[in-house]
Amino acid sequence: MLKILVIDRCHFTRTGIEALLNHSGRFSSSFLVSGINNLLLAKEHILQWKPHLVIADLNSFISETHSSPPINPFFMSCGVIPLILLQSADRQHAPIAPSQSVAHSVLTKHTTLNTLSHTIQEALQVRPALEIPKNATPLLTPQEEKVLSMWMDGVSNNAIAAALSIHGKTVYTYKRNIRMKLHLGNRFSPFLSLPGKGD
C-alpha cells in the first residue's frame, strides 16, 4: 500500500484527490491518502509518516499567511520523496519557483484528471526505494484529524467535544496524542505562525 500526503487548504482538493486515487479505477495500486490543511504541521507529518508521494498547493498558504510561510523547511522535509505542486491559476500572487530537483511536476488546478493521473503514476515510478508496508496506517486517526482541524480553527474544547459527541477529557487526550505524533512542544505550537494568533 502506497502512502500519499495531500497538503492543501481546500477540503475539496484533498477529498477529490483521495477519490481519484482510491475510487476512479485509474490506478492498479492501493493507496492510503492522508490530507492536511496546515503547512506548519506538514514537515513533521512528512518526517514521521514517510509518504511515497506528496501533492501540495503551497500557493494557498502564501496567499493566506501574513508572515513568511515555512516553505524551505517543507522542501527540505520532502528530501527525495517525489513532490507534485498544484497551483491555482486564479491566484494573484507570484507562483512559487521550486528548484527542479525538488518538484517532480508543477501543475495548475485546471489540469485534466487524465494528466494528473498520468503525472501521479510517473512520480510513483521514480520514487526512491522506500519500504512499502502491506498494511499502512495514517499518522493521525480520523478522529484525531477532526480534532486537529477544529483545534486549528480555534474551536473550544467543549465545542469540539459536543461536535464529535465525546467527553471533554477525551479532547485533551486527542490533543496530547496529536502533539506527541507531530512532535509539537506545547499546546499552543500549532498556532505559533498563524496570522492573528498570539497577539
From Swiss-Prot:
Read off the CDD domains from this record. LuxR_C_like
**DNA-binding region in chain numbering:** 157-176
Modification 4-aspartylphosphate, positions: 8
Q: Is Phosphoprotein set as a keyword in this record?
A: yes
- Name a GO molecular-function annotation: DNA binding
Function in brief: May serve to repress the entericidin locus in C.freundii.
UniProt name for this protein: Transcriptional regulatory protein EntR
Q: Which organism is it from?
A: Citrobacter freundii
Lineage runs: Bacteria, Pseudomonadati, Pseudomonadota, Gammaproteobacteria, Enterobacterales
